[in-house]
A protein has these predicted regions:
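Active-site beta-loop-alpha junctions enriched in small/polar residues
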Residues: 136-138, 166-168, 244-248, 303-305, ...
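Acidic, contiguous N-terminal accessory segments
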Residues: 1-124, 343-352, 358-388, 395, ...
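Charged, glycine/proline-rich intrinsically disordered loops and linkers
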Residues: 174-215, 355-387, 594-599
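Feature activates predominantly on carbohydrate-active enzymes
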Residues: 3, 8, 77-335, 342
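Beta-sandwich interaction modules
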Residues: 506-516, 526-529, 535-541, 546-548, ...
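Active-site neighborhood of glycoside hydrolase catalytic domains
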Residues: 269-419
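Flexible, acidic glycine-rich loops studded with aromatic residues
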Residues: 149, 391, 406-506
Length: 653
C-alpha cells in the first residue's frame, strides 16, 4: 500500500537537500515554475540547497531502464507518467509529455516536507486515462473559488473537467436565453425543494431535474468563461462543455416555448426533435460554446429523455428512432466542426432497473404520478423504449455510463456494441471490482456535483471525499476493494491537511494558551437530520442545520462567534465508519453502503474515534492572536433538542 499522497513508486536514500530560494528552476513552461512556488512550505531557506530543478520532456534510455530495474516495471511509455530523480546535483523531472512534466511538479510538492527532499528515485503512472469532475459554472462571486478548486484537482492529478453550460453563459446571438434564465432560477429558488415539487408531483408527465444552481442562477460573460477555460487548460485539463440537448434543456425553451415537445408545460424541458427550429437554436448555441471553449469533445447530454413522441409532430414515431436521429444530427454538426460527441448512456440500456420504481434507462417505462412511485402512484402513461438506438448511432460516440450502481453487467450492453465508456456520477468508495472493470475497457471515471460550485456544497455533497478517495483508484496500481478502511482513513487525513496546511507549522497543546494561532475544538452531537444531497434545487437551510455557536472571549471583553452547523463543521457521535456489503443484491441494489454523514464533514473537520464514539476536530484560526484569549465556550441553540459533547479543546502555537 502506498502511504500518503506521494508517487506510488519511491526509493529514498538517507541524505537529501532543501528546495530554497537559491534553487534555480529550469522549465520549458511558466506554469511548472508557478505551480512549484504557489504551494506553501515547499521551500525552506537557509539550508543546504539543491542547485536546480530541471524539467526534461523525454525519457532517456538510461533513466527508463533505471525505473525498470528499481521498481520491476515495464519501460515507461504512458504520456502522463513521470520520473523524479533526486541527486546531489539537482532534481530532474522526466516525462514524455508536458502534462507528464506538470504532474512531475505536483509529485515534487507531494514529496517535499518543509522544503526537504531525500535523494532517490520516484515514479508515478495513472491507472486510467480519464480522471474527471463534472460541475456547473460558478457565479462571478465564486470564480476565485473555481480556480482554487481546479488547483486542488491538479494536486490530485485529475485531467478532465466537464462543465455544464445551460443558461449560465452569455449568448450573444440569443440574449433572451440569459434574460429568461435569471427569472426562471429566481422563481425556482423561492424555497428549498420547490423544484422537486414541480418535477415529481405537479404534472401528469415525467420531468427532468431543474439545474437552477448552474451559475448560481446567474450567467457569466463569454470573456469570464474564456478566462476559466484558459486557467484549466494551462493546468493540462481537458475541458468538456456539457450542452444538454433533447432533454434537460429547459434553458433553450425559456425564451422559445414554441419548440417545446409538450406545449402546455409551463416549464418545458424537452424540445421537439421534429421541429427544424429546435436545431436552428441549438446549433447557434453550440457555435458560441465552441468559439469560447475550443473543445475536442462536447457532452450533448441526452440523459433522462422522458417526453418522447408526445407532440403532434412526433406522435407515431418510434422512441429509439427519434433518439438516434437526434444524436446523429448533432453528431454530424459537431463532426463538421472537428468536435467529438459524448452522451450520458442511460437511454441506450435495455435492462436497467431501479428498486421500487421498475424499469429505467432505455427500457419501456410505465409512468406514474408522483414520478417513479410505482407502489403508491397513479399510472399516467407509457414511455417508449429507446435502447434500440444503440444499434443506430455512430460507434465513436463516447458514452458516460452512470447507472453502474444498478448492475455491474449493464456496461456490457454498451461495450459489446463497440462503444467506449467512462463511468459518470462516480463514487469510488461505492464502486466494486475496480480493476476488473478497467480490464473490460473503461477509460476512467468522472465524479459529478449537480449543484452550486462552492466549498460548503462540494463538501456536503461528499465531492471532496470522493475525489480524494478516487485518487487512490486512479493512481494506485495495487488498489483493492479490501483496503477500503485504510484508504478511508488516509482520505480523511489528506483532506484535513490539504485544507489546513498552516497547522503543520505549529505545535499542538491541550493546555490553554493566551495567544494561540489556532484553536481546535473536538466535539460531536446527538442531533440528527437524515443525510441528503443538495442538488436540483434542494439547499441547506440554516434554521435546520445550525445547532449552536462557538464563542471565543478575550480579556478585553472582545467576543468572536462562529456558528456550529450540523453536517458542515460537526457530526453525530453515532456515525457509522464501516462499509457494509450486500452479498446477494437484487436487481438495482448497490453492493456497498456507507454512512455519508461521516464524509459530509470531511475537509473542514477531521473525524476521529474515541471509546466507540466519533468526534470531529474543527480548527478555528484565532481572529485576534494579539489579544489574550480568556475562554472557549461551546453553546447549544435553545430551540434545538440536542446536546453537543466536547471531547477536548486544543491550542496551536
Amino acid at each position: 500500500m502506498k502511504q500518503g499522497i506521494t508517487p506510488q513508486y519511491w526509493k529514498q536514500e538517507n541524505n537529501g537537500r532543501y528546495f530554497t530560494k537559491e534553487t534555480q528552476i529550469f522549465s520549458p513552461l511558466p506554469i511548472l515554475t508557478d505551480t512549484l512556488l504557489a504551494h506553501p512550505k515547499v521551500r525552506n531557506d537557509g539550508q543546504l540547497a539543491f542547485p536546480a530543478i530541471h524539467f526534461i520532456e523525454g525519457i532517456s534510455r538510461e533513466v527508463g531502464q533505471e525505473v525498470m530495474q528499481s521498481f520491476s516495471l515495464p519501460y515507461p511509455s504512458n504520456p502522463e507518467a513521470h520520473i523524479v530523480k533526486v541527486a546531489q546535483n539537482g532534481i530532474f523531472v522526466y516525462a514524455l509529455s508536458q502534462r507528464g512534466l506538470f504532474y512531475g511538479a505536483i509529485s515534487i510538492i507531494q514529496m517535499l516536507q518543509d522544503g526537504y527532499l531525500p535523494y532517490g528515485l520516484a515514479y508515478d503512472e495513472p491507472v486510467c486515462s480519464e480522471r474527471g469532475l463534472k460541475v456547473f459554472l460558478p457565479s462571478r462571486k465564486n470564480m476565485d473559488f473555481f480556480k482554487q478548486f481546479v488547483d486542488m484537482l491538479a494536486f490530485f492529478k485529475y485531467n478532465t473537467l466537464m462543465i455544464e453550460i445551460g443558461g449560465a453563459m452569455e449568448y450573444k446571438k440569443h440574449p433572451e436565453i440569459n434574460q429568461e434564465w435569471i427569472k426562471y432560477c429566481a422563481d425556482m429558488a423561492e424555497y428549498s425543494g420547490k423544484t422537486k415539487e414541480i418535477q415529481d408531483y405537479t404534472f401528469p408527465w415525467y420531468k427532468n431535474a431543474i439545474h437552477m444552481e448552474n451559475g448560481d442562477g446567474e450567467f457569466l460573460s463569454q470573456n469570464d468563461v474564456k478566462d476559466l477555460v484558459l486557467y484549466c487548460k494551462e493546468r493540462f485539463f481537458e475541458v468538456i462543455p456539457e450542452v444538454p440537448s433533447l432533454g434537460h434543456c429547459d434553458y433553450l425553451m425559456l425564451g422559445h416555448p414554441e419548440i417545446a415537445e409538450i406545449p402546455e408545460d409551463p416549464y418545458p424541458d424537452t424540445y421537439c426533435p421534429s421541429n427544424p427550429a429546435s436545431y436552428e437554436l441549438l446549433f447557434d448555441v453550440l457555435d458560441e460554446i465552441i468559439e469560447v471553449f475550443e473543445p475536442e469533445v462536447i457532452n450533448i447530454g441526452h440523459d433522462e429523455y422522458y417526453s418522447i413522441a408526445m407532440c403532434e409532430r412526433c406522435k407515431g414515431k418510434a422512441g429509439a428512432d427519434i433518439f438516434a436521429e437526434d444524436i446523429i444530427k448533432i453528431y454530424d454538426y459537431l463532426k463538421q466542426k472537428n468536435v467529438r460527441t459524448m452522451i450520458w448512456g442511460d437511454k441506450l440500456l435495455k435492462n436497467a432497473i431501479v428498486p421500487d420504481a421498475g424499469p429505467f434507462g432505455g427500457a419501456e417505462i410505465i409512468m406514474y404520478t408522483p414520478q417513479f412511485k410505482k407502489d403508491t402512484g397513479k399510472k399516467v402513461g407509457i414511455m417508449p423504449a429507446t435502447w434500440q438506438a444503440i444499434h443506430q448511432i455512430p460507434k465513436d460516440v463516447e458514452i458516460l455510463h452512470w447507472l453502474w450502481s444498478l448492475d455491474e453487467k449493464l456496461e456490457d450492453e454498451v461495450l459489446e456494441e463497440g462503444f467506449s465508456i467512462r463511468y459518470g456520477n462516480f463514487e469510488g468508495y461505492l464502486f466494486p471490482h475496480w480493476a476488473e472493470h478497467l480490464k473490460k475497457g473503461s477509460k476512467g471515471a468522472i465524479i459529478s456535483n449537480w449543484s452550486t460550485l462552492n466549498e460548503v456544497i462540494l463538501q456536503r455533497n461528499v465531492i471532496f471525499f470522493g475525489l480524494a478517495y478516487a485518487y487512490e483508484m486512479f493512481w494506485n496500481h495495487d488498489y483493492r476493494d479490501e483496503d477500503y478502511a485504510i484508504i478511508r482513513d488516509k482520505t480523511l487525513s489528506y483532506l484535513f491537511h490539504y485544507h489546513y496546511p498552516d497547522l503543520q507549522n505549529h505545535t499542538r497543546s491541550l493546555e490553554a494558551l493566551a495567544h494561540p494561532s489556532w484553536i481546535e475544538v473536538g466535539y460531536a452531537t446527538d442531533y440528527f437530520v437524515e443525510y441528503q444531497w443538495f442538488v436540483d434545487g434542494v439547499f441547506p437551510e440554516m434554521e435546520t442545520y445550525q445547532i449552536g455557536n462557538i464563542l471565543l472571549t478575550y480579556t478585553d471583553q472582545t467576543e468572536f462567534t462562529l456558528p456550529i452547523i450540523f453536517g458542515e463543521n460537526i457530526g453525530k457521535t453515532s456515525v457509522e465508519w464501516d462499509r457494509t456489503t450486500n452479498t446477494n443484491p437484487l436487481p438495482g441494489e448497490p453492493i456497498y453502503k456507507v454512512d455519508e454523514q461521516l464524509f459530509e464533514v470531511s475537509l473542514s473537520t477531521k473525524p476521529y474515534q474515541k471509546e466507540q464514539q466519533t468526534f470531529f476536530a474543527f480548527p478555528i484560526q484565532n481572529p485576534y492572536p494579539e489579544k489574550e484569549l480568556k475562554n472557549v465556550e461551546v453553546q447549544t441553540e435553545a430551540d434545538k433538542d440536542c446536546q453537543i459533547f466536547v471531547d477536548q479543546i486544543a491550542y496551536y502555537h
